[in-house]
């Protein structure tokens, strides 16, 4: 009577359905990538199949012959006599976190730069107002517009920072930010 044993779905497809025998780790990795039919990282695929090979050797299901890159792995009689069944495949639920969110970091940095410029503009308007009090009526409008722009930019920076924290799994701590734009008063 044959023993029934569950093995990983990938190894089942590779060793039983595709009847791979006398393979190297690289060959098994390449076949693994083909059956996964996805853009899996070759290094990760290598690690996964190598761990499986070691597990199968430990159970006496595979033997290795040779050394280094020339090492080849063969199915043992024990494995061939084994009634293997595939484990149910894990369904990979990939939240779209694999997307490249570096654009968000770039946008945040751009807004930070713009905020610094606007804050410098506000400082200059205040300085001009002190040096040339007769310009105050004209500077007030410019100062108010710069304050509004700085508040808008600060909101964008904070929003992007919070989103990036959520994506990286950090806890968002709401802080009160004070900027030069919010601290100065009309003189």
From Swiss-Prot:
Keywords: DNA-binding, Repressor, Transcription, Transcription regulation
Induction: Expression is repressed by the TCP island-encoded sRNA TarB.
Gene Ontology molecular-function annotations: DNA binding; DNA-binding transcription factor activity
Biological processes per GO annotation: negative regulation of DNA-templated transcription
Role, per record: Represses the transcription of several genes encoded within the Vibrio 7th pandemic island-1 (VSP-1), including dncV, VC_0176, VC_0178 and VC_0180.
Record-given protein name: Transcriptional regulator VspR
Source organism phylogeny: Bacteria, Pseudomonadati, Pseudomonadota, Gammaproteobacteria, Vibrionales
């Amino acid at each position: 009577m044959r023993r029934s044993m569950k093995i990983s779905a990938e190894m089942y497809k590779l060793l039983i359905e595709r009847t791979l025998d006398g393979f190297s780790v690289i060959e098994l990795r390449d076949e693994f990538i083909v059956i996964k039919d996805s853009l899996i990282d070759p290094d990760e695929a290598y690690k996964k199949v190598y761990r499986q090979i070691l597990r199968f050797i430990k159970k006496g299901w595979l033997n290795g012959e040779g050394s280094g890159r020339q090492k080849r792995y063969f199915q043992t009689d024990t494995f061939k006599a084994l009634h293997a069944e595939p484990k149910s495949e894990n369904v990979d639920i990939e939240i779209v976190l694999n997307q490249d969110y570096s654009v968000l970091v770039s946008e945040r940095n751009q807004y930070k730069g713009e905020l610094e410029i606007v804050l410098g503009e506000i400082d200059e308007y205040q300085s001009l107002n002190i040096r040339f009090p007769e310009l105050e009526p004209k500077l007030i409008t410019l100062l108010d517009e710069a304050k509004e722009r700085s508040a808008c930019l600060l909101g964008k920076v904070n929003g992007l920072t919070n989103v990036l924290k959520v994506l990286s799994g950090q806890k968002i701590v709401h802080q009160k930010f004070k900027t030069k734009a919010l601290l100065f008063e009309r003189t």
